[in-house]
Regions:
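Divalent metal-binding pocket/active-site signature
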Residues: 123, 130-146, 150-224
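Divalent metal-dependent hydrolysis catalytic cores, especially in the metallo-beta-lactamase
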Residues: 57, 61, 73-102, 116-129, ...
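Active-site-adjacent C-terminal substructures of enzyme catalytic domains
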Residues: 196-324, 329, 335-340, 360-362
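C-terminal cap of metal-dependent C-N hydrolases
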Residues: 6, 335, 345-367
């Protein structure tokens, strides 16, 4: 296929009016490498890389933690329709037996061209700090456990790419030292202070789970996890871009503080995403969704009800430059879990995960 005359998003964040060549599901460098010369006229359209969501629990009334193959497939189909072509289903804090079944589901689900591709699993619990549990069930939280993690990863067929860890919990140092070369260790759901977080980063935990949420605020005398992450140039940070979790001023300042290569936009979406107001569930707890805000009975925010593409558009509406927002939803998440060689930009050799939009970034077609 040859996609003609579109404004193609470049690796440097600029747009270039040019043709894009696709052969056997990969982007190639020239028309000479294309056997199927079918043309798609993209005049007046923007061409973006497919988005990469590394932190999402579910959508359209299904949750990864349901351990249901058909439900997971439905999630993947919804995500693809919304311009998300690479996806990390994300678990909640649950008993080990349930987690093993959940991770097996990701191995077994049937995927085709109608689905976002599972590029890894995000294991958000159970190695969290009860003080900052958020929407996770405290009774299932446990200390960091290397063998527990490895059993889960074995059930997942080695697909776990991310695991959240509270570095102030007993056993975290050993966990980080032992596993940081096997999985991306993400600091989150923690009351850790700056010193604790900085030491964990020094040991190899170079990712932060949904920055600002479920952690202490950054103070001028105690910078906490946020300050430690800002100070460590190798640390990447997730940020929920739904317009509910974080104030627009903080969103804009985060991009200024961390630059255009370290912010990873995530949806943190749950099963109410793509649905009407009503009652839903997350991690075994009832959630009320009203006007895109999902909360537990006590008012705790319980994930988002917004897909990543809409999160990206939301932060642009807050004043984040378009190029930075797109990079934060494509290249940065891909780099953060080590798959940028395959996805995240429209570069020859990579997967032809392509989203065509109008000038206002309304989706026209997803390839």
């Amino acid at each position: 296929m040859i996609i003609k005359n579109g404004k193609v998003f470049q690796e440097d964040g600029s747009y270039k009016v040019t043709d894009l060549y696709v052969e056997n599901g990969r982007i190639v460098a020239s028309a000479d490498e294309v056997t199927d010369k079918t043309e798609l006229d993209a005049s007046g359209l923007k061409i973006l890389p497919g988005l990469v969501d590394i932190h999402s629990h579910g959508a359209v009334r299904h949750d990864f933690s349901d351990a249901d193959v058909d439900g997971l497939r439905t999630i993947l189909q919804y995500e693809k329709s919304q311009g998300i072509t690479s996806y990390c289903p994300t678990s909640m804090t649950l008993p080990k037996e349930e987690l093993l079944k959940i991770f097996q589901t990701a191995k077994d689900v049937e995927q085709d061209e109608t689905c976002a591709r599972i590029v890894g699993i995000n294991m958000e619990g159970p190695f969290l700090d009860p003080v900052k549990k958020g929407a996770h069930v405290e009774g299932y939280i446990r200390k960091p456990d290397i063998e527990f993690f490895r059993a889960c990863n074995e059930a997942a067929g080695g697909m776990i790419k991310l695991v959240t860890l509270a570095p102030n919990m007993e056993g975290s140092e050993e966990f980080i030292r032992e596993l940081h070369n096997e999985v991306v260790i993400s600091i989150g759901h923690t009351a850790a202070d700056y010193g604790c977080a900085a030491e964990a980063m020094k040991e190899g935990a170079l990712h932060v789970t949904h920055l600002y949420n479920a952690m202490n605020s950054m103070g001028h005398r105690e910078p906490g996890v946020i300050g430690a992450a800002a100070d460590n140039q190798d640390c990447m940070v997730e940020m929920i871009g739904d317009g509910i979790h974080i104030h627009p001023v903080t969103v804009r300042n985060t991009f200024r503080l961390f630059g255009d290569s370290r912010v990873v936009l995530i949806s943190d979406s749950m099963m109410a995403t793509g649905m009407a107001n009503g009652l839903y569930e997350l991690g075994g707890q009832e959630v009320t969704m009203k006007d895109r805000k999902a909360t537990l009975a006590d008012g705790t925010i319980a994930g988002s009800a917004t897909c990543l593409f809409d999160c990206m558009k939301c932060v642009i509406s807050m004043g984040v430059p378009e190029r930075e927002a797109i990079l934060a939803a494509t290249a940065n998440p891909a780099r953060s879990i080590g798959i940028y060689n395959e996805v995240g930009s429209l570069t020859p050799g990579k997967r032809a995960d392509i989203v065509l939009t109008d000038e206002e970034l309304n989706i026209v077609k997803v390839l």
